Structures are given as C-alpha cells and as structure tokens.
Amino acid sequence: MSLSHLYRDGEGHLDDDDDERENFEITDWDLQNEFNPNRQRHWQTKEEATYGVWAERDSDEERPSFGGKRARDYSAPVNFISAGLKKGAAEEADSEDSDAEEKPVKQEDFPKDLGPKKLKTGGNFKPSQKGFAGGTKSFMDFGSWERHTKGIGQKLLQKMGYVPGRGLGKNAQGIINPIEAKQRKGKGAVGAYGSERTTQSLQDFPVADSEEEAEEEFQKELSQWRKDPSGSKKKPKYSYKTVEELKAKGRVSKKLTAPQKELSQVKVIDMTGREQKVYYSYSQISHKHSVPDEGVPLLAQLPPTAGKEAKVPGFALPELEHNLQLLIERTEQEIIQSDRQLQYERDMVVSLSHELEKTAEVLAHEERVISNLSKVLALVEECEHRMQPHGADPLTLDECARIFETLQDKYYEEYRLADRADLAVAIVYPLVKDYFKDWHPLEDSNYGTQIISKWKSLLENDQLLSHSSQDLSSDAFHRLMWEVWMPFVRNVVAQWQPRNCEPMVDFLDSWAHIIPVWILDNILDQLIFPKLQKEVDNWNPLTDTVPIHSWIHPWLPLMQARLEPLYSPVRSKLSSALQKWHPSDASAKLILQPWKEVLTPGSWEAFMLRNIVPKLGMCLGELVINPHQQHMDAFYWVMDWEGMISVSSLVGLLEKHFFPKWLQVLCSWLSNSPNYEEITKWYLGWKSMFSDQVLAHPSVKDKFNEALDIMNRAVSSNVGAYMQPGARENIAYLTHTERRKDFQYEAMQERREAENMAQRGIGVAASSVPMNFKDLIETKAEEHNIVFMPVIGKRHEGKQLYTFGRIVIYIDRGVVFVQGEKTWVPTSLQSLIDMAK
C-alpha cells in the first residue's frame, strides 16, 4: 500500500517540489478514514522525536513494524485518488437547497464501505494485510486455558454454590450461556449495516426500538451533520398576538400618537447614521424611514475574500417590510383604541348612573327643605299676625317660646341656618320688654330667670362669644340681654348704695349663670367697682361704725382679684387708725382679723410688723414679773395676738422683752434661800401660759431649759441642799419630766408630718418628691408662700446665693448658712422659715 496520501496538499494533490514533506492539514481522506483501524500510519522514529524536521529520513533505517509497515516503493506508477468536491463548491451546492427540499437519506442508501478505496500500488501488496494488525479470533477459544490447568476456577465456583448448567447468583438469575458477539459485515460505524443484535440478545431482551423513531432520529442527526450553522436557511417563524395580549399591552405606539406640547418644539440631532441629521420634534424621529443608509451591496461589489463567506440575500424589500409593519402597528393601535373607548363608555355609563342617583337624592332633599321652609314660614306668619296690636289672641312670651321650641325640634336645620337675630328682634324683643316693665331686681332677684334661661337655649349660638360688635350683631340672645335686660340693671345700680351689698350680690348670683360672661364683667367692672372704690375713699375707720369688711368681703366670690386695688387704701387707713392704738383695745383685732385671709401672707405680715408688733413689744416691756404678786393683763394682751402675728414674731417679742426679766427674777429668787416647791410651781405655771406651738419653737425651748439648768445648779450647791433636803431630787425629776415631754412632743410632730406627707403623696408623682436639700427648701418655701430664688451673679466661696423671703442664704453640703452681721451662720430649716416669715 502506498503512503502517497500523506504527501498531498490541502486539496489532495501531490507536491511536486518536495515529495518528502509531510502536510499536517486535515483532508477529506482523514475524515473518511477516522474510524478505519487499517489506515496507514507513519511511526515516528527516535531520531525524528529528537531532531524533529531536521532528522535524516532513510528508508533503509526504518524499523519493521508488526502492522505491516513497509518501505516506499518508488517503482510503482503514480495513482490519483479523488477527494470529492472542494469546500467552496460543496458550500454552494448546500446553499442552493433548503432543508425542506433535501432528499432524506435512508440507512439502506448509506455506503457499505466508509473506508478508503483500495490503491493499486503494485505487486508488493499482500492480501493478508486486509485484516487488523496483530488481530486474532480469540473469542473462538475463550476459556481454553482451563484445559492445561488444575481447574481451580471451576472448583472455587462450585465451593461457593455454583451448579454447572445453571446461572450465577443466589436465585440462579445469571445467564447460562456466554454473551454472543456478532461480526460486523464491513468497516463502517456502529449501526451502518443494520441491527447488530444476536439471537441470544433477542431472546433475553425481546423489546425492540421503533424503526420510525430510529429513522427520524437518524435523519435529524444526518441533517445536522450536513448543515452549515453560519449560512443555513431556517424556516420562517410566525408570531401571533391575541386581542387580550394587545389589551394587556395597553399602550399607543409612538409613531401614531400626537406629540406632547412640551416636546413638540424640541430640536433633536440624530447622529446614529453616517451623517448628522437635525429634527425639530420627536414626532419627526418617529417618522424616520427604516431603510438603511446604504443599500444592499451587490455580489460584484463585495471583496474577494467576502464572496466566499457572505451570502447575498435573495429577497430584500425594506420599503415593503416597512409598510407591512405600519399596517400591523396601525391595526394593533386601532384594537387598543377601540378597547379603551369601550372601557371609557362603560365608565361613563357607571358615572352617569351615580350622578343620576345623587341628583335624585338632592332633588328629594330639596323637596323636603322646601316643605319644611313652607311650614316654618307659616309659623312665623302666625306669630306676626298675633303680634298685631288689639288682636283677638295676643301672643305671650311663653307661647312664643313654645313656637320657637317647635321650630328647633322639628326643623332644626332650617332653624339653625335662619337669621335668628332678625326674627328675635321682630318678635321676641317687644315681648321681653313688656315682661320686665314692672321688674324690681333688688326686691325680686329671681324674677324672669326661668323664662330667660329657656330663651338662652333657643337663641344663643353653640360657640362661646366674646364681647365684640360682630358677635353682638350675630348672636340673638346676647343682643337681647344687652338691649333689653341691661337697661333695667343700669337703672338699679345707679340708685344702689354700696354699704347695702346683700341684695345686689344676691341679684348677680342669681343671674350669673344666665347672662353672658362679658355682660357680667361689664356690670362688675363698669358699674359695681366704681361705686365700691368711691365708698372706700369716703370710709373712716375711726368714725364709721360699720366695719368695712362687712360690705367689701361679700363681693369676693364674684369679683375676686378685681378688689385688690381697694386693699391698698384700706391698709393705709387702718395704719393711720392704729397709730394711737393700745393693745388693751380689743376692737382692733376684730377689725383686722377678717383681712388676714384676704390679704397675701407677705402683705399681712408686713402690716403686722409695722403697726401691731411694736405696740405689743412696748406692752410686754411694761410687764412686771413678781412671784409674790403677779399682774398678767399685759401678758394676756400680747398673747391674745398669737394667731394674728407669726410665731417667729411672737417668739422674738418674748426673747427681747419677757425671758430676760423672767430669768433674772428666777436667779434672784434662787439666791435668797427659796422654797424649791414654790419655784417649781412658778416655773410650771409660766410654762402653761404658752401654747404648744410656741413651746415647740427652739428659742423658747432653750430659754426654759436654761431655767432648769439654773435651778439644777442652785439645788446642787451645799447651802441649798442643807437648807432644804430632797430639793435636788425634785428638781432632777422635774428636769427629766420636762425633757421627756419635749421628746414626746417632737416624736408626735414627726409622726404627724410623716402621716401628712404620706397622705399628700398618694396622688403625687414621684417627680414632686424632693431629691436633695435644695428641693426640700423649695418645697417648704412653696408651702409657706415664701419667695425662694437664686441671686443672679452673686456667689460666696463658689456657692450660689439665694433669697429666702428677705434673707440671703447659701447651701453647702446639706447645711443652710444665713448671712449675719459679719459672718455666715448655719441654721436649721425651721429657724430659716421662722426668720423668713
């Protein structure tokens, strides 16, 4: 067999210039002999593997091979083998026929011999070389080696339970006979010569494949093998759209819709083509022709290299395609527009039906309103007819109120929207004037309150109105009270005497919840207060027998803070009257006591310190303490003011004018061989003259404890003990008893304060509980109405200064320091409160 096929060019021709050159291109012969095991191969020598193309090739040095490889015979004639059509010609042939027109190739028509044709190369060819290299029919004597062995395999199988003549496996499910092989007729691929199943296979597996399916699969695979993916023609694909799909799409094509106003005058520069184009609206772009800028190139115009690969379209009409596309889009848009118009008409029908229902409701409502207005007009005309003078059935105020109640109950909407002011002026005002023509307010203060209360509910608007001309004109009841009722009140107040306050106070109390608030304020501010102020200016506390509080204080519930301008002249006149007053005159207390709860705590304390406390100090200074003959009148006069002046002021008087003299008398008495029983009684007697509140004061406690210490020192001396045996024990017992009383009193006070705090804290938030000493001082200041505030920009040793009433203090580590004459003195919280009062 010649090896000339290894030295052919890409098209199967021999290379005349270099016969020894091996071409590595894949030819048609290579493709056809791909599965041929008998094809000739060139075995590479060791020298060729080492030196490659520079190796020296010598036919004499070639090794003999078992595959029948032999040296090249140059004496044989030259033969040519047809390699079929060229690639270009094959492609042209394929492009002329479509897949649909191809003749189906059946398995019967497939060539039986896919290998290369036999070459006539001369006499050196041996027929024995037709077989496979080194191949033998080994399946004929399969297992024959067991003849020359000990049969160990058969013995092992029998030990494991194998029975000759039966299949392998637990249930003998294995095959008995060995697998048969079927020899293929030719050298083609699998299945090229029909079914290759043996008789044994058909018996064991009787299910056969469908011939039609196999044929169809074969044609499909064959067609795919022969097609060119880049240049093959495909069947046209059609896309269908239903009406529902077009409705779901629901949009109008840009080419058919009118441009928007804001986009109709936009300048657009199109640079998508080879040349720049200018459009003056987006709508012009939508009408841009779909034909490409350059025509379809002809075959003659194509470059030589492109002519082999590119294919010329056989049918290209872009204008026709464009027109067809326009028709399709126009039809789609007509369908969409028709659907939208149908939906619009349906919505219009629903909307008109709703409007019809609403119109019917409005019509029925208007008919009811007309009917109600006609009935209201009939009632008003009846009232006007009965209002005529000298009528047979004159209208009264009560009957008119019932008619208005009917209007309000049955025809509320019409009554609420009607102009009640004009209706009341025409009908109600004359009746009210006639009703109050003989009225005396101070004699019968409740006259007309019920009927006016009824008219208030009928005529007054829902909202609360203030005093203004607009509100007065819009609210019928306010106008009624101002124009009809108010003139009667003005006449009565003009004739009223302020010292006779009870009738006027009762009258205003009866009408306060009926008349408008602004009318009541006008009466109090413009009518009552000027008369009271004038009467206070004319009042003289020395000559007037009627106390001023008797005709001023009854106005407190009605006027409250309006009376504060009267307090200043009252205090001034009382101060003038007390200049020559003596504590023995008890009438001053009767005059001043009602003012204690009226005046503020600060102003009251200032008034007491200015006018009363100095007088009491002079009286207490005149007190003579005589254990043998004591006159207590001056002491009683002073202690009688205990509830009028503060405890701190009273204690200050006692410290200054009483206790020094009292302790001096005690020391004198103890130095003259006294009777300690009498001294004890005298001590207890004076202590019983003070109230518990005064005795609880620290200064008073200190003074009485000082007296006990003096008595203990006196009784501890030898002279006193010798003069009166047992006195020391009595004084010690007295001291112990007094100290125990003080302790019990303090414990009781603490318990009371704790109970008060517990009761007060039931509904109090946790934030109100004082968290530090400053908060505690602030709480106490609020309880005693004492001003507690920081002094801006003032500090002492870095501590903020505060004003506690009239006292300047600062707080350092939970201790209050009070400013003294030269230094800061620490003090207790109770002492601070007493000093501030």
UniProtKB/Swiss-Prot annotation:
Q: Which SMART domains match?
A: G_patch
Residues where Phosphoserine is found: S2, S59, S95, S98, S144, S210
> Which segments carry the region annotation Required for nuclear speckle localization?
710-734
Pfam families xref list: G-patch (PF01585), GCFC (PF07842), TIP_N (PF12457)
- Single GO molecular function: nucleic acid binding
Query: Where, per UniProt, does this protein localize?
Result: Cytoplasm; Nucleus
Main location per UniProt? Answer: cytoplasm
Which stretches does the entry tag as region Required for interaction with DHX15?
A: 1-50
Give the record's GO biological process terms: biomineral tissue development; negative regulation of protein-containing complex assembly; spliceosomal complex disassembly
Which keywords does the record carry? Biomineralization, Cytoplasm, mRNA processing, mRNA splicing, Nucleus, Phosphoprotein, Spliceosome
The biased composition feature labelled Basic and acidic residues covers 1-13, 44-64, 101-116, 217-231
What protein is this chain from?
Tuftelin-interacting protein 11
Region Disordered: which residues?
1-21, 34-73, 85-135, 183-236
> Family assignment?
Belongs to the TFP11/STIP family.
Which residue numbers delimit the G-patch domain?
149-195
Q: Which InterPro entries match?
A: G_patch_dom, GCFC_dom, STIP/TFIP11_N, TFP11, TFP11/STIP/Ntr1
